[in-house]
Amino acid sequence: MAACATAPPQPLPELSSVPAAFEASGRLAVRQGQRSDIAKLRWTRHRDSDVWVISSPLGNEVARVESGASGATLTRAGAASESAESFQSLTEKLLGVPLDPNEIASWLHGGAPGAAPGEWKVTIDESQRAGRVDLAKRITAIRGDVVVKLVVDEYRALED
């Protein structure tokens, strides 16, 4: 029976400011028209790079999107890697929607832009205080017929 027990969630860090580097994991849902994708997401962000490891709901790694100063790479399980200039173009290829890690990092740390034409209408559905920083636990972003939901299960600041 102990093998079935889930580990208790990690306590939130005490943050004095938004960290330049962090690791977050949780669930990502993207819906556009009739297309709908649900996945587990493990995100590692450093000042100059992002890595998203996208897994099936059962935990099998499906794809990895990495970006840095030299561009971005999409690696799918069992397929050749694809390169592009931007992270967004590869998330569009993978999920049908261009997702900007800079925008999502801002939302994660409590910044939600207004709903100007063409921008995401972002709602922080649930957040927690981590020292002086509000960390979003549940985010809903809508732009046109696209709905993106992110649920953050674990978060930790990293040294950069």
What is the role of each PLM region?
Residues 49-100:
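An acidic-aromatic
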